[in-house]
Amino acid sequence: SRHGVMVLSWSMDKIGPMARSVEDLALIFQAIIGPDGKDRTVFDLPFSYDGQSDLKTIRVGYYKKSFDEARRHKDKYLAVLDVLSSLGVKLQEIELPEIDPEIISFILNVEASAAFDELTRTNQDELMVRQGQDAWPNVFRQARFVPAVEYIQANRLRSLLIEQLTSKLKEIDVYLDTPSGPSLLLTNLTGQPTVVVPCGFDDKGHPLGITFI
């Protein structure tokens, strides 16, 4: 449930646990899932994790372009594919939906603007520290000029995007992506859950992650 969490985007906001291992995440998730009567977007769906799956039966799809064109740390992300392959995981290239999620990403800005509309209307947004062109106060202000027709049309495309991605994911068990890949925006719009796990460190010792969807 998102009850008690500060709203940013009603149709995209999601919460999830953080832990040191996937096993710990699964235990926490098992404890917090399900309706609590305070968030109408929560569905009562089954969840189980026993950690006993045979890796050789798991089909992992990946968008090759994300790995080939990773802006940084390409070697680390390609190494993930090598490790999975060595464990017997079935890797297969997949294509993403035809609809570019970037063209409807403004849905987030519009919904965030609505959530913080009182700040904008009362000029309290001027008290926020960051006031750059891409900072939230200006995002809130600019979003007020987005026509309702465009917002509705964008959500129509979003529905098609959800259908397309759901269809493609039926061909695999898990979709793997890099941090610079399209999955962050894509899953924000489509709602597919993700798990981010560590996959090494950069030259300065900062942790790197890889996303399983």
Task: Set out the residue ranges of the language-model regions.
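A short helix-breaking turn/cap at a secondary-structure junction
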Residues: 1-78, 122
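Short, well-ordered beta-strand elements
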Residues: 17, 206-213
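Short helix-loop capping/hinge segments that flank enzyme active sites or metal/cofactor-binding pockets
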Residues: 54-63, 106-159, 198, 202-209
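Short glycine/threonine-rich loop-to-helix capping motif typified by GTGT followed
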Residues: 73-76, 101-112
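Short hydrophobic alpha-helices that are characteristic scaffold elements of the AMP-binding
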Residues: 187-189
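Short beta-strand->loop structural element characteristic of the AMP-binding/adenylate-forming
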Residues: 194-196
